[in-house]
């Protein structure tokens, strides 16, 4: 049996969240794993979360403490510390939980079909209505079925499909092989958004084969989630949209020879610009100054921001 390393970035403010995630790890039907928890200066102390674990469980966990680096930085620390005898890395966000067969399904699918990268489906409550399962891809995309129970598929045009809508992919359902965990890393500077999507794309580009499993691998939780904690009126919203634009701009350089992917990327970039500008218009309406420093940085990177501002102004005046 191959050994897996579980990488969990930890930054939470409430008790019991990490403990719940770890309980789902130790309930796995495949038991050949070690756990790396990266304490990213979590406000709620990790020692309290580990206190109730059995001794044999505690011995299978390595805690690495670091200055706060955001989710991508924490996962990079995990990837940099994967034991030499590990063949796979499975990611789990500390506010999510795995279903019992997640690691077993991943291991069997990746070894049987010689895949470097694997995703399972994810489930969750009404707050995560936008997620959809792997089986739903068959309604609109060309899918090759590899096995029926559980349903495992591959998409010949995965790169184009995921850039059109990546809501069937989630970090807590992702498992990667040695070829990827030895060389692919997160863009740690993107702390507020899109570091996961950029990592997904880099892994797909570096893989000889990617397989997708319809069986749910994880259930989404509702702990502290940096992306979802920022609403349109948050002071951090503009930076979040800029992070998104930077990630998309990076992807544009990766996919210049794929017209469908480029079309999707440019559409998302346009949306990021418009949402950013609307947020600044709302600040003005509330008699607050726009965030000129970050707008200037964005404009320096992306002169098309002026065109988007003009479009919004014309649209406002024509009403």
UniProtKB/Swiss-Prot annotation:
Organism annotation: Rhizobium meliloti (strain 1021) (Ensifer meliloti)
Keywords: Cell membrane, Exopolysaccharide synthesis, Glycosyltransferase, Membrane, Plasmid, Transferase
Matching Pfam families: Glycos_transf_2 (PF00535)
CDD domains for this protein: Glyco_tranf_GTA_type (cd00761)
Cellular localisation: Cell membrane
Root EC class: transferase
Protein name, as recorded: Succinoglycan biosynthesis protein ExoW
Chief localization: membrane
Pathway annotation: Glycan metabolism; exopolysaccharide biosynthesis
Lineage, highest ranks first: Bacteria, Pseudomonadati, Pseudomonadota, Alphaproteobacteria, Hyphomicrobiales
Family per similarity comment: Belongs to the glycosyltransferase 2 family.
